[in-house]
Amino acid sequence: MSIYVGNLSYEVTQDTLSAVFAEYGTVKRVQLPTDRETGQPRGFGFVEMGSEAEEAAAIEALDGAEWMGRDLKVNKAKPREDRGPSGGNRGGYGGGGGRNRY
């Protein structure tokens, strides 16, 4: 299971985020998604710890903590399929303008 880390500074790197979480146990993996077009960080990331106990300790200590001038939001990451509809499907009708044929 992963930890979601939100409200991150755009200056954060995988190394700096890993160092913060390493205080609470073994960091197995850090992901910092970036914007496809700009390559800039998107302000959130995911951290995978060595055990559930280490994850719980990190979440307890870091949720709401200030780091790099921002208040972190730290909690268990939800699996993709549990996040509800993606918003990609906007429904039927193909679109045609507002002109009346008659």
UniProtKB/Swiss-Prot annotation:
Region feature (Disordered): 73-102
GO molecular function: RNA binding
Superkingdom classification of source: Bacteria
PROSITE patterns, A to Z: RRM (PS50102)
Gly residues: compositionally biased ranges: 85-102
Entry-linked Pfam families: RRM_1
Residue stretches of biased makeup (Basic and acidic residues): 73-84
Keywords associated with the record: RNA-binding
Domain called RRM: residue spans: 2-79
Official protein name in the record: Putative RNA-binding protein RbpA
Organism of origin: Nostoc sp. (strain PCC 7120 / SAG 25.82 / UTEX 2576)
Gene: rbpA
